[in-house]
Amino acid sequence: MRLQRQVVDYALRRRSLLAEVYSGRTGVSEVCDANPYLLRAAKFHGKLSTVMCPICRKEQLTLVSWVFGDHLGAVSGSARTAEELVLLATRFEEFSVHVVEVCRTCSWNHLVKSYVLGAARKARPTRPPGGSRSTRTARDGARTASE
């Protein structure tokens, strides 16, 4: 069973941003701007990656997963571990996950990927239950130019 859907990878944007930093067009202070909440989330909820920080090259990056969804309530907008993501996926309808890489030494941070988890929303039936055809006339379903 595939859990992640609608995956968006931001690797090209990352490469482009790093090229700007390495060429001097973008300052290091502009990309090393992780706020304290993100750094704290990296410490307690993050997963250590195998990738070294592209800016300071002093430590491995930490991956932090953030969840967002209207029906998540207080959980929305918080960092979650991989185990918590699996649990949330079984309990809630669709919600989005944003994975951010962060360096706890120099505060580099960048969105790595985003995807959707949770039970897929059920599609609405195209025909009424029971298989009978609708008795609506064409005019009832028609739209006017002002709509």
Segments (PLM) and residue ranges:
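N-terminal alpha-helical interaction blocks
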Residues: 1-36
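C-terminal/domain-terminus segments
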Residues: 2-8, 113-147
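Short Cys/His-rich Zn2+-coordinating modules
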Residues: 28-43, 81-89
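Short, flexible, mixed-charge glycine/proline-rich loop motifs
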Residues: 37-50, 91-97
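Short cysteine-rich clusters marking metal-coordination/redox-active sites
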Residues: 53-56, 103-106
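Short, non-ligating residues that shape and space the ligands of small metal-coordination modules
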Residues: 59-63, 109-115
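Short cysteine/histidine-rich metal-coordination sites, predominantly Zn2+-binding motifs
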Residues: 67-78, 118-126
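Short Fe-S-cluster ligation motifs
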Residues: 80-97, 134-139, 143
